[in-house]
Amino acid sequence: MRFTQIVAAALCLGATEAAVAPIDRARKVLGNQHAFDKRDASGDTAKAPKHLTSKNKKFYVDPNSIPGVPFDIGESYAGNLANTPAGNSSLFFWYFPSENPEAKNEITIWLNGGPGCSSMIGLLQENGPFLWQPGTDGPVKNPYAWSKLTNMVWVDQPAGTGFSPGPPTVKDEIDVANQFSDFWKNFMDTFDLHHSDVYLAGESYAGQYIPYIASGMLDRKDSEYFNVQGITIIDPSIGATEVIIDAPSVPALHRFNNIIDLNETFVNDITKKWESCGYKKFMDDALKFPPAGPMTVPGKSAGCDVWDEIIAAVKEVNPCFNIYHLRDNCPSPSNVMNGPKNFFNNKQIQEAIHAHPTDYRLCGESQIFGPHRNDRSVPSSYGPLASVIERTNNTIIAHGDLDFLLFTEGSLASIQNMTWGGLQGFQKEPSDKFYVPYKDGSEVGGAGFVGKTHRERGLTWVTVDLAGHEIPQYAPTAAYRMLEYMLGRVQSLTETH
C-alpha cells in the first residue's frame, strides 16, 4: 500500500473514531474491579453473644479466633454431641444463630453427601457466613449466607465423616436416621430450641440421607424436637444409578457437546450403545407429562456403563474436566479444601471450633455402610421421599444444569416414576421461569431469569441454568431464593417484583 493510501485510510478512520485498545473498551463497560473483588473481607467490631448460656458455653466459638480469617465471623457454636443414647459416639456441628427476627422459631440443617463427605465444605465454599472458594486468595464474608435468613447448623454425619469420630456403624438409612435423631435431640436440648420448625437441606448423597432422616423425625410425632416443615435436596441422589447417571448421560452429551467437544465418531458409537442398553426407550417414556404408567428401570448390563466411557473420552480432550461443573477447563483452580494441608486440617482451627484432633479429609475413605460402601436402603424416590412430600407439603428438588455426574434429566426421570398425592409424576412439563430479583450484592451471584420451576402436590422442581452440582456455590442468589421459598418468606419463585 502506498503512503498516500495509508494517509487516506487514516483520515477516513479519523472521521469516525480513533483506534481504541480493546481492554480500554472492556474497562469502560465492566469497570476495573472483578465482581468477586467487591466481596467484603473487612474487620468488624465484635458483638456480645445473644445466645450464650451455661449449657452451651463450652461450644462457643470466639468470632475472631479462626486462623486466616481476618474478620469477625459472627456468633457461633461448634463441637461434638452424642448421637447414641449410650453416648459412645458423636456428631460434629457448627451452629450459627441468625440475627434475622423471622428466624426466631426455626432452624435449618445443612448436610453434604458422599457418603462420607464433610458438611464443612458446604459451610466454607457454598452457603456459610464466610467463604473461601476455589481460585480465590482468601476468606470473604458471604452476602448470601443462609444464616442471614435462618438459624443454620452444618453437621458432619454419619459417624466417621469429617470431624465426627468413627468407627462407622451405620448399615443403611434407617441407622442414619436413628443416629441423627439421637444427636438432634441433644442439640435441641443444648440450645433450647424446643418446638422450633425444622428444615433440612443438602446436596448430592444428602438426597438419600435427608428423606430418610426427615421421615424418621416425622414418624416420631414429637413436635418438641422433630417438627419438620420442609426439605430441599440439590442435585440429589434419589434414584438408581442407571436412572440418575447412565440413562441421562448421552442426552446431556448431545446437549453440551459444543462445550465438551467429543468427535462425531465417538458420539455416534456411544449413542448406539445407549440405545441398545435400553436407556433411550426409558428416557423417552420417563420424560412424558403425565407419565403413561410405572416404568421398568433398565438393569445394569455388561458394556452399559456409558457414562464411564464418556468421561474417559472427555478426559482425553480436557484433562481438567470437572464432572461437577462441565464448563471448567485447565488449569484447575487451587482449592483450600484439597489435600493434606486443607483449611480444616489445622491444629489451631480445630482447637478454635472444639473439634477432636483429626487428620481431616473432605471426603474420607472411612467405610460408611461397611467395607464396600453398600447402602442397604433403596433409593429415596423408591422409599420415603413421596411420604415426606405428602406430610410436609413443602419439598424442593433442585438441579444445576451443568452437573455432569447427577443429571437434571435423571432427577426428573426419577420424579416421573414416583407416586405421591394420588398421582404418578408431574402432570405438566416444567416450563415456568425461575426468577431471582435484582438487589444489592447480586453482582456476585446473578439475577433475573435463571432457570425453570414447577410445583405440583407439594413438590417444587427447580433448575438453575448456570450452576453445577453445588448450586449455592455457583449460583448463590438462586440458592438463597430457594431457601426463602422453603421458609415461607416468599410465596413464588416466578414473581418478577
UniProtKB/Swiss-Prot annotation:
Q: What is its main location?
A: secreted
| Keywords from the UniProt entry | Carboxypeptidase, Glycoprotein, Hydrolase, Protease, Secreted, Signal
Please provide one cellular component term from the Gene Ontology annotations of this protein.
extracellular region
Q: Which residues form the signal peptide?
A: 1-18
Organism classification: Eukaryota, Fungi, Dikarya, Ascomycota, Pezizomycotina
Q: What does this protein do?
A: Involved in degradation of small peptides.
Q: Which Pfam families match?
A: Peptidase_S10 (PF00450)
The protein's name is Carboxypeptidase Y homolog ARB_02032
Q: Which residues form the active site?
A: S204, D403, H469
Per the UniProt record, which EC number(s) apply here?
3.4.16.5
Residue pairs linked by disulfide bridges in the UniProt entry: none
What are the glycosylated positions? N88, N263, N393, N417
- A biological process (GO) annotation for this entry? proteolysis
